[in-house]
Amino acid sequence: MIFMTAGELYLIPFFIYVFSYMFLLLRKKRFYQVFISLIYSGFIIQSLIFFIWLNLRGFKGMMSVDWIVFFNAWIIMIVVVLFNLFYKAKYILIYITPIVAINLLLGFFAPHVYINIKSIFSNFDQAILLTHIILILIGDSLFALAFIISLIYIFQERRIKIKKNLKLFDKKNHPFDEVFYQGKGYNLELLDSMNYQCLKIGFPLITIGIAMGIYLSNSLFKSFMIVKPIEIISLATWLIYAVLLHERVAKGLRGKKAAVFSIVGFLLIISSLSFSFYLFPEFHGFK
């Protein structure tokens, strides 16, 4: 591994995830188990890459753009694996792993340019920045999962109305269907419950993360009056999820409407990231 660049290392779990879907398409019980094993193998390799990087470089006041993207992919996978273990809903691995794979590919193409935060922030503020990044990424990962679950909910609800179960394939009487689709898999109540848990855990993390970001902005610019596009979009995203959480807790909002709110909120997050990394080269106000 020492003879490979960081970007090349990111491609190892990427190709494992892509390769795993070949076994899924075969639609055999034994191949489905291979698919799951490959997904977990990819996650283990992601984890090894992260901890090797941590051991070699650590957090010494320098962060590269490609590493942040890779770290985001790793956090998403941690969230999905934990939800799968807790809810026993393996189908979420099928739907969200492609997002992880895309992040790994973006990490490969992202510039290996280090952001020297040591020259910008004090040691205390560096710790705040690291915590800010971790909380935002975990919160965004939970919202990404809520986005996927919301899409599944909407499509499954529609399929129920026409008395069909949501499937990746339409063939009937296949052993793979018995293994994967029966049980509590696409139960609407379970989907709604997972959606709510993503919101309930993710919203406080995002709130604390945004508050830390505001503190860091004030520390950097010595003023709360400098407002950047990323902050406006972050606030808009926060308001969407704040309204959604309020409606769910105070008014018992559930089902399709809650799913639509989650989808809109996540699309705003995607817009926020686009503004940060592509439309504004000096994202967050520093190079």
Segments the model singles out, each with a brief description of its role:
Residues F3-N116, I136-F155, L168-Y181, L191-L216, ...:
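Hydrophobic cores of alpha-helical transmembrane segments in multi-pass integral membrane proteins
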Residues N116-L129:
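Interhelical loops and loop-helix junctions of multi-pass membrane transporters/channels
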Residues L54-N55, F121-N123, N218-S219:
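Short hydrophobic "helix-edge" motifs at membrane interfaces and signal-peptide entry regions
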Residues F155-N165, S219-F224, H284:
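Membrane-interfacial segments
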